[in-house]
Every structure is written in structure tokens, then in C-alpha cells.
Swiss-Prot record:
<feature type="domain" description="HTH OST-type 1">
    <location>
        <begin position="3"/>
        <end position="76"/>
    </location>
</feature>
<keyword id="KW-0963">Cytoplasm</keyword>
<comment type="similarity">
    <text>Belongs to the TDRD7 family.</text>
</comment>
<dbReference type="InterPro" id="IPR037978">
    <property type="entry name" value="TDRD7_LOTUS_3"/>
</dbReference>
<dbReference type="GO" id="GO:0002089">
    <property type="term" value="P:lens morphogenesis in camera-type eye"/>
</dbReference>
<dbReference type="GO" id="GO:0070306">
    <property type="term" value="P:lens fiber cell differentiation"/>
</dbReference>
<dbReference type="InterPro" id="IPR041966">
    <property type="entry name" value="LOTUS-like"/>
</dbReference>
<dbReference type="GO" id="GO:0010608">
    <property type="term" value="P:post-transcriptional regulation of gene expression"/>
</dbReference>
<comment type="function">
    <text>Component of specific cytoplasmic RNA granules involved in post-transcriptional regulation of specific genes: probably acts by binding to specific mRNAs and regulating their translation. Required for lens transparency during lens development, by regulating translation of specific genes in the developing lens. Also required during spermatogenesis.</text>
</comment>
<keyword id="KW-0744">Spermatogenesis</keyword>
<dbReference type="Pfam" id="PF12872">
    <property type="entry name" value="OST-HTH"/>
</dbReference>
<dbReference type="GO" id="GO:0007283">
    <property type="term" value="P:spermatogenesis"/>
</dbReference>
<dbReference type="GO" id="GO:0003729">
    <property type="term" value="F:mRNA binding"/>
</dbReference>
<feature type="domain" description="Tudor 1">
    <location>
        <begin position="500"/>
        <end position="557"/>
    </location>
</feature>
<feature type="region of interest" description="Disordered">
    <location>
        <begin position="295"/>
        <end position="318"/>
    </location>
</feature>
<dbReference type="InterPro" id="IPR035437">
    <property type="entry name" value="SNase_OB-fold_sf"/>
</dbReference>
<dbReference type="InterPro" id="IPR002999">
    <property type="entry name" value="Tudor"/>
</dbReference>
Length: 1071
């Protein structure tokens, strides 16, 4: 828990950055943008943030306007009043005043602290009182402060003599604040905003080593500070957050640690080791004791004991008590158990889910109080807070090396000093003798984002597949290098040949195709060399000794080939059937890549995108392992009994199971797995890395079944297909289990035991099945144990005839079949089917004739908009910025400058969470009949996702025209894709805001202008400056007139209306 005065100091610093105060509703965001943490008001004993702010009047002054909005202002104190006075005195000429008046981004705030450090140095006796410095500022407007200030780009001013020493306040700022990674992706880069200080040469060279400050204490020199930091890290050998080192330093030595020192820690390898841990767009830094210990240093035991004696005498009783409590509740065994759980969730685990997983795994209760203070686990995992609720955090496991060190893992290999020195000497000699070794070639940089394509050039082992990256950044560079090598060695035929080849040497090789390749010598055998051309193609070739030549021309070009591993195929890498399948599917093909793990040998999923449908190569190769004896071989005109229907789709197709040897074998294997898992900790088999095509286990109705992951919607929700029943559902990642390794081969070799089929003898113009017919079929064939069927045609799906199993075979007549009965029911319903419209006070619903509306135009709504959803069932309208204000938005749809849809950027996280909950609920819920009415709210399934929609019209043949309320899109969907919208999904305001671009004249926009506008703004985060709000009775019908600003380009703000006007002028000139 943070100290109250520490939080108050940080809060005062946040409030000082805004001249006009900060609204209470934005205070948490501003606090976190500066410190990287939320205001822990609940930990401090307050129910609300306003109550906490009201309890510290010496720090915060509260103002409440006529509308009831609360604004917080900083209260001046002796530590900061002189800064405010000095700033006001220079407000007309000094651009530094912008740092005190405006709400700053993180990087500028840190630069302000550097300015205050410089001012503190000026009062040192060693400095002249007439010190001047020049400040050059490149000011970039922030999204929520896009205003123009008229000031000079540089000015010179003098620090006044009367300015007393400013005592700097240290508060925990996460090291991430100094990284560009903290700035959100939608916010522009301010990296070019720099300060340049030019100090006069008035330094007193005879100044003493340490100087006095206003408090009378002596400031230690650099050597003493470094020794103190070493002492702190020797006690905390499990690591200390860089953001916490200043606090621990102050509590231990009763002195503040300068921010300049914090910035220099990364450049002091003899003092500490800094490890960077990335999670998403954020980067954290952890300090560890220096790995290189000088020979003169005492042993580890003596050093630890000495450092503990030094620090324990200076640590306060409060800190000591808290550390004892932490050690009592967070033992090494407990933390190791937490690590074992988090390792299975590399994409992160919600903190509130940890207690249940812990109890399931270890049959012990999760310690109380840990969730309220997740920093106790910070040495083994990264805690990412997503709201002001402490439990609403995501935990990420740290790297293995970091975790082992944090858990005091001492079982490490000790290398004797003599052997180590000999090895280092040999390594240095080899580098001097062969400077062109492979280590001199730059490593291949794996693309960090965007689509990645590779060329598969060697498939000898799926665990070491040889690929070459293709694309403009790779293929072009490779071809250019080959051309240069060919030109160089062709002109320099006398280039020195290898006289004494050595293993590991990098050489150039002339191939039969008149090309020159880079290679490394891997063996020398009786005047013949074995080379590995892995700098380019990774193939092992043998040449005569005189053939290779020294490669000094292209050593600095990075390799374009790399080894990779195909996930899911590791266990079967030695199977010849699998190797043949991999070669058939991938060899010498350009494939798309999904990178699951970035390591020395990255883990991939390959996709063949050359056809109409993308083929998952990993999943396809597994099918080569199927045991042919377990496959279902159906014969035409053959009667099969004891058939079970397992799934019926909305288009009338179905999946069936037949008694077979494969089904019996599958049941036997799943029973053995069930018995095995009963005696194991099931959490050990949690799916840690889900990907499309992965085969897992899912507990359905008390029995384990095989499922294949088909869609990954989010970190929690997945779309799966039941391999042996044909059902499709959405499940949570935590509900899936890995197949135990000892049963993996048995499970994979059994082919799917469900066959896809359809009914025979249906009229050719049946068309789309009506919902009533599908429901009738499900009621009559699902959950019945036995049927008889006869195969009529064998295609990609079987065309079947069905009979009830209890009918004797002698009575299997055509008129008694399910086919004929469903046929009659289908046409009976098509004659009088209607879509009901239930609105109070409305006329009876219109009937359909043969599935068609009375109106001839199928695109015209069958029912006009009459009546709207009651106000109590509609969520509150989305709060917007005031006229003239700025807000971050995301443009989801862009038709033309006169109509586009924006979403508030800060609410996108909440919307994604809502969509995830809807997917999980509706995919598992039973379908219910729905009374459709216009202007009513529903949940609709569109492209495998569930959305909140309002029905705009009812079309013929069971189609609906709907408007997606959170994305602003119009869609036409089938009526069977609609379900009631629950109350819990109506709380979040609808996110789509209709908008019109300000600054341009309203007109009939041409297709060319619309396309240019759409390509410029659609699917992009921008800044909106609202000029007008046109209210409406329905929240989804109101419209805003706004400017749009693109701030993604450093140092440049692109106003979209200027871009549109310029584009229109160019189009006019072209005409």
C-alpha cells in the first residue's frame, strides 16, 4: 500500500500541471498518465475518490460549478509557491511556462522535473548567481489541448537571485514513463520535444567535493550514491522496481534520490543490472545486483550480511513491519505456485481468477489480502491495472531467468575461474583469427507487426523448418546482395581463396547456377568442405576446398533465412507420414505466418493462401496421421442402423455418428484420459497458447470431448468445433485442457467420427430452410438414440434417407421416412408462415404469401417504423465533449465527409469487454423464439460475433434490416440470427456517433472524393474538435459536426478538412 503523504505529493504534482484545474472525472486518468498507477483511495480508507480528495484540503482545493461538476486545483505550499511565482513572472516570454499551465504529456512532465533540478543546482555556492541558459522547445499540441500559443521558439532568461532552493519531491513514477511505449497508440509522438541547456563557464573549479543545501544536509557524491544503491540491491536480491528505488533509498538513508541518478542507472553496469519487461505497449524496469562482481569483493554471504546490517539499522519500523508481513504471506513456495499457474497463460490472467485456479491446483486456500495488494507478487509477475479497482488487473508471468532470480534459485552451474579464463581467451583468439565468422553477420530481425510471409526451403524436420522471409524488406535486400556479390567476385577473379579453412569460418561460395552465396564451414574432411549456407538458404552442400573464397564483401548483410518450429507437430516430428505431408503442403511455397512465440527458434502456424480458402498447414498435416482403419467408409444404397444425429445446422445439414471401431476406440481413450485427470491437477493442463487448428479437450456434460479451435475472439473467448459431433460453440480459454502427452498419439490418430450429410428427396427449389422447419427437425431427430439411414449419393456430404429405428425393416417405406415428413412440414409452413411484429397498439402483423411479402420490392421494409423502444430499456446517452472541446475518437465507418461514424477511444476497452461477454453468453445459451418488431433492440450474430442492433425493417424470406448501434453499420441478416438483448447488455451507452466533417461545404460528394476521404480516416484513431451537437430523441440518431485531426505524424497535425479541400481542388484540376 502506498504511503498517504506519497500519494498526496504525487497528486499535487499532477494538479500543478493544469492552470485551470482538473475535473474530478478526469483526475484518475491524469494521475495514472504521470505515475503509471491509480489513486488508491480505497486502500487509504475512503469509499469514493471525492471523499479522499476532500480529506486533504492542504493539497487539493475543490470547486463546484453550477452544473455540479467538481474541479480540483492544487494548493500552494512552501515547496512549490516559488515555482508558481517565478512562472507567472515569465508567462509572457518563457515557453517553459507552458509546462506549468497546460496539462502535459508524460515526456514533457519529466523534462519539467529536469528543469527544476537545474534550478536547484544554480543555488549551489559553486555556481555564479548570474547564470543564464537557453531553452529551445519544439512544442507539439496534445489531443485534448489542441490550441495555438504565440511564443518564440527560443528565449534567454536568467534564474533570479532570490529564488530559494527548491526541494525536489520524489514519488513512485514507473520507469515506463520515460519510454515511448507508454504513450497510447493513438497519441502522437513527442520524442522531438527536447531541452538544450547552455551553461556559462562560471563554475568554481576549487569548489568542495560536496556542497550544502538549504536543509543543511550534505549531498553525497556519485561514488557514495553508487555504494548505497549496491547495498540496497544486495538486500533485495530478488529485484527492485526502478519506480520504487527512490522510495526505498529515501526511507533507508533519509535523503532523496535525484531523478538524474535514476536516468543514469542503466549506464552503471558495475552497480546494477537493469532488466526490461514488456507487456503490451508498456515497458517496466527492474533493478538487480550487478552480475559482474570484482575479485576484491567479499563473498556473497559476507556481503549480504554486511548489507543487511547497514540497511537494517537505517530502515524505519513501519517498513520493517510491512516487509515481515509480506514475507509471511508471500513465501517462495507460494510465489512458485503462482508462477506455475501464470506460465500457462502467456497472454495474461485476470487477477480475480487467480484464487480459484490456485485452489483447484493445490487444494489450498489463496492467502487473503493478496488481491488488495498485488504488488506483493511484483517480483514474479507484471501487474497491469486496467481500472481503479485493484482486483481488475492482468497478471503476466516474467521471463524464466528473471523469475528464477527473484525466487532465489541458487542451483546454477559454477564455472571454475581458470576454465572460464581459458575459454574466454580461446574465444578472443578465434575472433582475431577469423573476424569474418558468422557472429559478425547481423541477426535476422523478425517482423514485429503486420502480415508476414515466408518461403519454405527445407522441411527435413518440423521442429527446425528452414524458411526465408519474403517481402520488400527482405527479398529486395537479398537480391541486391546477391547481385553485388556476383559483380564483385566476377571482377575480382583473383580474390584470395581459402588456404587453411577452419570450422565456423564465413565464406562465399560459387554455385552451379552462376550465383554467389554466403556460407559457413561446418566440417573439413580430406580436402572437402561441408558448408552450411544458412545465411541465405540454410542448405548443407559439399564443395572442393579450392572453391570457396573469403567473404569480406557482404558480412554486414543480415541473414534472410531462419529456423522455425511448427506448433502442434513437435511430438510427431520423426513420423515419415507427417514429414511427407509437411513437404507436400509447404515445400517451396510462400505461406502466411502467425507467430506464436518469438525466440531463437520462433514458433509458427503456417497458412496456404494461394486458393480461395486459407488452409491451416499445421492442422492439415495432422490429418496425415489418421489411422485408416478407423475411418468411416460408407457405401451407396447401403442401410445403416443405430445411427445418432449429433448436430443440425440452420441450413438443414446435419452431422451423424455411426457405430464403428473408431468410435469405440475413441470412447476407450477418452475414458482413460478422464481417469488420468481425476488423479492429476487439472490446472497443469490448461491451454497456455491457443491458436487456430489446435486440438484440445473440453468437458461437456460431464465427459471429455475433442474440440478444435476455429476462431480466437479475445484472450478469454474462443470459437471451437466439436470434432466428433460437428457442433460449433464459443467457450472460455480456461475451460479447455491440453491432451496429456502419453495419450496424444492415440487421440490424434482417430479421424473425426461425425459425418456431414443432408436429407434426400427434397424438391430442388426448396431454397432456405425456414426456422420452423429446422426446429421441427431438431425436435424429431435430436437426442434420439437410434435411427436407420440409407445413403443415396456420396459427395462432399452424404445424401441420406432416414427412418425411425423402431420401425421394422420390412416397413421402411418412402412415405414413412423422415425425409417425406419434413418435406410436408416444410411446405406446410411456407404456405402460411408470417413474421410477427409485436408493438403495443399496432395493427395485426402482415402475412406472407409463399414466403414473400405483399410488397414486390424485397428491399423495402415490410413494416414502417412505428414506435420505439421504451426509455427505460435504452441505455443512457453517451457523454460527449463540450462544443469546442477535444476528444480522442476512432472512425469505424466513413462513407463521405457528410456522414461517418466515430467511437470514443476511451470506451473501446469497455465495448470489447461487452462483446466478449455477449459471445460467451449467446454461444452457450439455448435459442429462443423471438417476436420481431421494428425499432426494437436485439442481439444479432453477424460474422460469428454478437452485436447490439435495432431492427429498421423486416424484409421478405425471413431477412431483417438492422443497424449496429456500437459500430454504425447497416446489415441484412437472417431472422434466426437474432436473440433477445438482456438487461445486463443494455447498461453501456451505444458507442456509434454519427458525424459530419466541419470546415467543408455540404454537397453531393463524388465517388472519387468519398474514396479519398474513406482511405484517409476509416479505421484510424483521430482527434475530434466538436463544433455542434444535433440532439435527437433517440441517442443513436443524434449527430455531431466536428473537425478531425490526425496527430500520428511527429511534429505535424494534419487537419482532415484541409486535406479534403486540397483533394477536391486536385480533382477539379484533373477534370
Amino acid at each position: 500500500m502506498q504511503e498517504p503523504d506519497l500519494v498526496a505529493k504525487a497528486l499535487r504534482s499532477v494538479l500543478h500541471s493544469s492552470k485551470h484545474g482538473i475535473p474530478l472525472s478526469e483526475l484518475q486518468d491524469e494521475y495514472r498518465s504521470l505515475t503509471g498507477e491509480w489513486i488508491p483511495f480505497r486502500h487509504l480508507g475512503y469509499a469514493t475518490l471525492e471523499a479522499y480528495v476532500a480529506s486533504i484540503p492542504e493539497v487539493v482545493r475543490i470547486e463546484r460549478n453550477q452544473t455540479g461538476e467538481v474541479t480540483c486545483h492544487a494548493v500552494a505550499c512552501p515547496e512549490t509557491i516559488y515555482v508558481r511565482v517565478w512562472a507567472v513572472a515569465h508567462k509572457r516570454t518563457s515557453p517553459i511556462f507552458l509546462l506549468f499551465c497546460c496539462r502535459q504529456n508524460i515526456e514533457k512532465t519529466l523534462q519539467m522535473i529536469r528543469v527544476l533540478d537545474i534550478c536547484a543546482i544554480f543555488k549551489d555556492p559553486r555556481w555564479s548567481s548570474e547564470v543564464s541558459f537557453v531553452v529551445s522547445v519544439s512544442v507539439c499540441l496534445r489531443r485534448d489541448q489542441l490550441s495555438h500559443h504565440g511564443f518564440k521558439r527560443s528565449c534567454t532568461f536568467t534564474c533570479p537571485e532570490g529564488l530559494p532552493l527548491i526541494q525536489m519531491v520524489s514519488f513512485p513514477i514507473k520507469s515506463i514513463l520515460s519510454e515511448k511505449g507508454l504513450i497510447p497508440a493513438y497519441e502522437k509522438n513527442h520524442s522531438n520535444s527536447e531541452f538544450y541547456f547552455s551553461l556559462t563557464d562560471n563554475l568554481n573549479a576549487s569548489g568542495v567535493e560536496t556542497h550544502t543545501v538549504a536543509s543543511g544536509r550534505s549531498v553525497p557524491n556519485i561514488s557514495e550514491i553508487q555504494n548505497r544503491i549496491k547495498e540496497i540491491l544486495s538486500k533485495y536480491r530478488n529485484g527492485v522496481w526502478l519506480s520504487k528505488i527512490a522510495q526505498v533509498y529515501e526511507e533507508t538513508y533519509r535523503e532523496e534520490l535525484s531523478t538524474t541518478v535514476l536516468r543514469q542507472l542503466e549506464h552503471w553496469p558495475h552497480v546494477c543490472t537493469v532488466e526490461k519487461v514488456r507487456t503490451g505497449d508498456q515497458t517496466y524496469r527492474i533493478l538487480y545486483p550487478s552480475k559482474r562482481i570484482p575479485p576484491a569483493v567479499k563473498s556473497n554471504t559476507e556481503q549480504d550480511q554486511a548489507s543487511q546490517n547497514v540497511t537494517s539499522s537505517k530502515a524505519g519500523p513501519v517498513l520493517k513491519t510491512s516487509r515481515e508481513a509480506e514475507s509471511a504471506s508471500c513465501s517462495s513456495d507460494f510465489k512458485q505456485n503462482v508462477v506455475n499457474i501464470l506460465v500457462k497463460y502467456p497472454c495474461g490472467l485476470w487477477a480475480d481468477a487467480l484464487p480459484k485456479l490456485y485452489q483447484d491446483a493445490y487444494q489450498r486456500k489463496f492467502p487473503e489480502g493478496i488481491l488488495n495488494n498485488l504488488q506483493l507478487l511484483s517480483d514474479v509477475c507484471v501487474v497491469d491495472y486496467v481500472s481503479n479497482v485493484p482486483q481488475k488487473a492482468i497478471l503476466y508471468v516474467k521471463t524464466q531467468s528473471c523469475t528464477d532470480e527473484n525466487l532465489n534459485v541458487t542451483e546454477k552451474v559454477q564455472i571454475p575461474d581458470g576454465a572460464k579464463a581459458t575459454a574466454e581467451q580461446q574465444h578472443e583468439e578465434s575472433k582475431e583469427q577469423y573476424p569474418e565468422s558468422i557472429s559478425s553477420v547481423p541477426p535476422l530481425v523478425i517482423p514485429s507487426e503486420g502480415p508476414v510471409s515466408v518461403l519454405v526451403i527445407d522441411v527435413n524436420n518440423p521442429n527446425e523448418l528452414i524458411i526465408r522471409y519474403v517481402g520488400k524488406d527482405y527479398s529486395g535486400a537479398q537480391e541486391q546482395m546477391e547481385d553485388k556479390m556476383k559483380a564483385y567476385y566476377s571482377k575480382n577473379s583473383t580474390a584470395s581463396q581459402i588456404t587453411f579453412p577452419s570450422v565456423g569460418q564465413l565464406v562465399a561460395v560459387h554455385t552451379e547456377e552462376e550465383a554467389w552465396l554466403r556460407a559457413q564451414i561446418i566440417s573439413v574432411e580430406d580436402k572437402r568442405l561441408k558448408l552450411s549456407c544458412f545465411c541465405t538458404y540454410f542448405g548443407c552442400i559439399t564443395f572442393r576446398m579450392c572453391k570457396p573464397k573469403e567473404n569480406t564483401h557482404c558480412c554486414m548483410k543480415q541473414c534472410t533465412s531462419h529456423k522455425c518450429k511448427l506448433t502442434g507437430l513437435e511430438v510427431f516430428s520423426d513420423d515419415p507420414l507427417l514429414l511427407k505431408a509437411v513437404e507436400l503442403q509447404a515445400y517451396h511455397k510462400i505461406c502466411a505466418v502467425e507467430i506464436l512465440e518469438r525466440s531463437d527458434i520462433p514458433v509458427f502456424v503456417l497458412y496456404d493462401t494461394s486458393g480461395e480458402d486459407d488452409i491451416n498447414i499445421n492442422a492439415t498435416c495432422l490429418k496425415a496421421l489418421y489411422d485408416k482403419s478407423f475411418e468411416l467408409n460408407l457405401q451407396v444404397d447401403t442401410l445403416y442402423t443405430n445411427v445418432r444425429v449429433t448436430s443440425i445446422l440452420s441450413d438443414g445439414n446435419m452431422y451423424c455418428q455411426l457405430p464403428s471401431e473408431g468410435l469405440s476406440k475413441l470412447s476407450e481413450v477418452l475414458q482413460k484420459i478422464e481417469y488420468y485427470l481425476l488423479h492429476q491437477e487439472t490446472s497443469e493442463f490448461n491451454v497456455s497458447q491457443p491458436y487456430c487448428g489446435k486440438i484440445c479437450l473440453f468437458l461437456c456434460k460431464g465427459k471429455w470431448t475433442r474440440v478444435e479451435i476455429t476462431i480466437i475472439h479475445s484472450r478469454r473467448a474462443l470459437g471451437v468445433r466439436f470434432i466428433d459431433t460437428g457442433r460449433v460453440a464459443y467457450v472460455k480459454v480456461t475451460d479447455l485442457r491440453e491432451i496429456p502427452s502419453q495419450f496424444l498419439r492415440e487421440v490424434i490418430k482417430i479421424p473425426p467420427q461425425a459425418i456431414k450429410c443432408c436429407l434426400a428427396d427434397l424438391p430442388p427449389d426448396t431454397g432456405m430452410w425456414t426456422p420452423e422447419a429446422v426446429l421441427w427437425l431438431r425436435d424429431n431427430v435430436m437426442d434420439y438414440a437410434e435411427f436407420s439411414m440409407q445413403v443415396s449419393v456420396m459427395e462432399k456430404r452424404c445424401v441420406l434417407k432416414f427412418w425411425k429405428a423402431f420401425i421394422p425393416i420390412s416397413y421402411l417405406l418412402a412415405d414413412r421416412s423422415i425425409n417425406r415428413r419434413i418435406n410436408a412440414v416444410l411446405w406446410k409452413h411456407q404456405k402460411d408462415v408470417f413474421l410477427s411484429v409485436t408493438s403495443q397498439g399496432l395493427a395485426p402483423p402482415k402475412h406472407l404469401n409463399q414466403g414473400r411479402l405483399e410488397k414486390s420490392d424485397s428491399l423495402e421494409p415490410a413494416v414502417e417504423s412505428r414506435g420505439v423502444e421504451s426509455a427505460t430499456d435504452v441505455p443512457p446517452p453517451l457523454p460527449l465533449s463540450e462544443v469546442g472541446g477535444f476528444m480522442d475518437v476512432y472512425v469505424s465507418v466513413a462513407c463521405h465527409p457528410g456522414h461517418f461514424i466515430v467511437q470514443p477511444w476511451k470506451e473501446i476497452h469497455n465495448l470489447e469487454a461487452l462483446m466478449e461477454e455477449m459471445i460467451l453468453y449467446y454461444s452457450m445459451a439455448e435459442e429462443r423464439p423471438v417476436n420481431i418488431g421494428t425499432n426494437k433492440l436485439y442481439a444479432a450474430k453477424i460474422e460469428n460475433r454478437w452485436y447490439r442492433v435495432i431492427v429498421k425493417g423486416i424484409l421478405r424470406k425471413g431477412f431483417l434490416s438492422v443497424y449496429v448501434l456500437d459500430y454504425g453499420k447497416h446489415e441484412v441478416i437472417s431472422i434466426d440470427k437474432v436473440q433477445p438483448l438482456l438487461d445486463k447488455f443494455r447498461k453501456l451507452p451505444f458507442q456509434a456517433i454519427k458525424a459530419e466533417l466541419a470546415g467543408v461545404k455540404s454537397q453531393q460528394w463524388s465517388e472519387e472524393a468519398s474514396i479519398i476521404f474513406r482511405n484517409r480516416v476509416e479505421k484510424k484513431p483521430l482527434v475530434a474538435q466538436i463544433q455542434a451537437i444535433n440532439e435527437s430523441t433517440n441517442s443513436w440518431d443524434r449527430k455531431v459536426v466536428t473537425y478531425l485531426v490526425d496527430t500520428s505524424i511527429p511534429d505535424t497535425d494534419v487537419w482532415i478538412h484541409d486535406f479534403v479541400c486540397q483533394s477536391l481542388a486536385e480533382l477539379s484540376e484533373a477534370d
